[in-house]
């Protein structure tokens, strides 16, 4: 279904959603630890619910309320249900694949039509190199995995997805030998590896770093029960900040920022480079935006989810925005580079599509348009924000926001947006 968006102004105090990446990691690690491990401020979205259900299929006993969950009992071999549906969640299927390789039972992992187009081969090859049997068609889901991996030395390319490395890191301490992990090529999305290691540390497991983002060793260890509080999601915060830059008036964003590493926090630096004044207190963020932004060249190799919220700011820049080193954004839920180039051109932004990014330039010919988000949650949200700036826009596939920000439309309308589901 589509939404109609009219020109809007946002004001008031909004709460930023909890972090999706940390919610995923904490749910998996709490399920490996068990013993009443608790996660506070967890994000309940389609993707994280897929992770909760995957852990239940692995045998974990999980209780949840509106903002938290408790894992009573951990993942157990004798309770495993041998088929896991990760829905649309790449993080779920990739981390679950590593966990599946720890067991001798054959486990099938699959997902929706979009997930079945996302690459898994580098991870499957790595798991097979240490003893797993992995069966797939062209290295994509559905896949069948049979363990048991024993550990040892593993090499894996880092230029496809950091989720492959996170999967190996998480399963490594539960192997007999531990894992010596060698990352080939240039690693993309480095901060997500930092997030994985930080979450593991919170659950009592240490990772020895020999060369950052290149060589790690994880000895045999046991995950320990703990209480973990999920911080705000800087990926969602970036979208709210772009909304504030384009459409905000006394718009205040609240949330527990915390001190865990998040690569997307660089968006604050990006906004300041563009000429936006950003004020960050312990639990609230506000922006003061000039009438026109500066433009500039931005390397998003470590923060691919910032591509959509940065791209739409080209509507307000004096000079072009050039986004580079984000080729891996083509391997997200959609080819975000191609879709942004195509759809932003409809509203009058001058777009040049590059293999690894975009060059975006403002124009005098902005206009409303019908925008196709291709069921990508982040594209839907930023196209709505563009619609608030321009007026007279429609955007397809509003259901996609269930993946990361289920209340997006309700929240935006509460604070002044004019978004109508058609």
Ranges and model annotations:
Residues 1-422:
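Short, structured segments at the rim of ligand-binding sites
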